[in-house]
């Protein structure tokens, strides 16, 4: 961790290690500041708990048994300064983000939440921002050249959300 930060990283997102050893969140926050500790949460709709999501780890393959909203709150209480929230159910589909998930997590924590999974166009980013996302991560929409960064930014701006000019 120290090496990564010394190479110029401002933040480090941790998922699997945090689930396996939650005290790591506090250790990182105390050593480097909570602004550096980003809790990465990979969320899947739960088959066990209707209307809820379960946190996964190991690249979305392993069940944690943690309710996502409760895990986000616990992570913040332990020292996480941001949440990187990914909907595994929507990831790569480019059909919109899980707005219910975004609302549930952003209303439960008082730290910035970066949301990912499902962006197919600029309107999806606008919807996520309106649902409470502080920032949006997107990949497939750009990897598969469905839209350019400039087109996304134009759509986002047209939707009334502030975005830095290219």
Regions picked out by a protein language model, each given a short descriptive name:
Residues 15, 40, 116, 138-139:
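Generic beta-sheet signal
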Residues 25-32, 126-166:
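C-terminal helical cap(s) of enzyme catalytic domains, especially alpha/beta-barrels
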């Amino acid at each position: 961790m120290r090496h990564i930060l010394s190479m110029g990283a401002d933040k480090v997102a941790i998922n699997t290690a945090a689930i396996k050893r939650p005290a790591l969140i506090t250790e990182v926050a105390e050593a480097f500041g909570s602004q550096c500790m980003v809790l990465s949460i990979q969320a899947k709709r739960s088959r066990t708990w209707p209307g809820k999501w379960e946190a996964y780890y190991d690249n979305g393959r392993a069940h944690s048994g943690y309710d996502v909203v409760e895990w986000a709150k616990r992570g913040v209480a332990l020292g996480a300064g941001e949440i990187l929230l990914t909907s595994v159910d929507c990831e790569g589909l480019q059909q919109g983000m899980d707005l219910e998930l975004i609302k549930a997590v952003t209303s439960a924590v008082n730290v910035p939440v970066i949301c990912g999974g499902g962006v197919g166009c600029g309107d999806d980013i606008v919807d996520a921002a309106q649902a409470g996302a502080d920032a949006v991560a997107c990949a497939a929409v750009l990897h598969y050249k469905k839209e350019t960064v400039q087109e996304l930014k134009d759509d986002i701006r047209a939707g009334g959300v502030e975005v830095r000019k290219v």
